[in-house]
């Protein structure tokens, strides 16, 4: 088993533990005893993709609409361009507007053609770190907390991050 696959599987186990036992789990306390773990597509190396970054030089704050029809401030970091099955795609990448300048966390909200069928209808997220080489690992795509609990307010992927391809990787709908 590849090292990347082992890391993803370990990440999934830790997430299940968090959702099952942590006080801050998004699974409502009254239904947590029924929670048997999250559902995922099998790991697929096809969806661990090297991407080219196109930086955006702007301090403009973007107000991302949330599931509660409020706004959360983000700064556009740039775009990641990548290829799946010979076709090129592009996703906007964001930084939270309220974090420290040295925070290297990047946020990629997206939808694909599995959204609303096999995966959460409002979309999924991927977190990556700033680096000189970028890899998007869709095997780590996850549903926002509002997929499990309506009390959460989650950013909705902007239209520019709606992909016209099936991403059969990462987290699936919880049944």
Model-found features: residue ranges?
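N-terminal domain-onset segments
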Residues: 1-59
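Mid-length scaffold segments of soluble, non-membrane domains
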Residues: 64-121
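Extracellular/lumen-exposed scaffold segments
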Residues: 30-35, 58-76, 90-93, 155-163
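A generic structural signal for short beta-strands and their flanking turns/coil linkers
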Residues: 45, 76-78, 102-106, 132-134, ...
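Extended, aromatic/histidine-rich regions of cofactor-dependent oxidoreductases associated
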Residues: 5, 133, 142-175
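Residues that act as N-cap/strand-start positions at coil-to-secondary-structure junctions
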Residues: 34, 43, 74-76, 120-122, ...
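Surface-exposed peri-terminal alpha-helical interaction modules
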Residues: 35, 49, 55-64, 71-74, ...
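Acidic, glycine-rich flexible loop segments
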Residues: 109-142
């Amino acid at each position: 088993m590849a090292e990347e696959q082992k890391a993803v599987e370990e990440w999934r186990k830790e997430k299940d533990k968090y959702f099952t036992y942590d006080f801050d789990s998004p699974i409502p306390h009254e239904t947590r005893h029924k929670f048997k773990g999250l559902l995922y597509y099998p790991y697929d190396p096809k969806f661990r993709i090297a991407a080219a970054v196109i930086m955006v030089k702007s301090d403009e704050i973007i107000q991302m609409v949330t599931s509660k029809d409020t706004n959360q401030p983000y700064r556009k970091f740039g775009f990641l361009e990548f290829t799946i099955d010979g076709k090129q795609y592009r996703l906007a990448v964001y930084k939270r507007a309220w974090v420290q300048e040295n925070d290297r966390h990047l946020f990629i909200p997206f939808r694909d053609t599995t959204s609303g069928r096999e995966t959460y209808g409002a979309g999924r997220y991927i977190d990556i770190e700033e680096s000189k080489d970028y890899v998007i690992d869709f095997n780590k795509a996850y549903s926002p907390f509002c997929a499990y609990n309506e009390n959460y307010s989650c950013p909705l992927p902007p239209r520019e991050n709606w992909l016209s391809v099936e991403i059969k990787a990462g987290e699936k709908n919880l049944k």
